[in-house]
């Protein structure tokens, strides 16, 4: 990887972090789009995952007293189920599929009818959110717009 690509990735990570911090959204999607433009799908997924783990993990540490562990457990179980299913069938999205899903993800959350919108207070919804968000993460690398609706 050239120094120019590394510099572009570092600058993009910084700028999209500011976008997320200021607007509270969209930074991860922009970052993933740039990663997919410059890297292969597996490389983009790993780099985005490590970046998100660092930023979201730190945020979880800072806000740990506000975590609803019931919601966390349900989400974690759903995530594990989706991850297990993907591991069994060994699906890796192609770049065109990843870009298409990345592009439609913001509209999925807005297009859901009221009765299908995920709600943290409703029974089983944290589990369902874990499944849906993990599938989106494994296909497009982002799930923020769906998680925001949740």
Residue ranges of model-derived segments:
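Membrane-interfacial loop-to-helix junctions in multi-pass transporters
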Residues: 1-8, 119-125
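Specific transmembrane alpha-helical segments of multi-pass solute transporters/efflux pumps
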Residues: 41-42, 75-87
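Residue-level recognition of pore/gate-forming positions within transmembrane alpha-helices
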Residues: 52, 79-83, 103-106
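Transmembrane helix exit motif
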Residues: 56-64, 87, 91-124
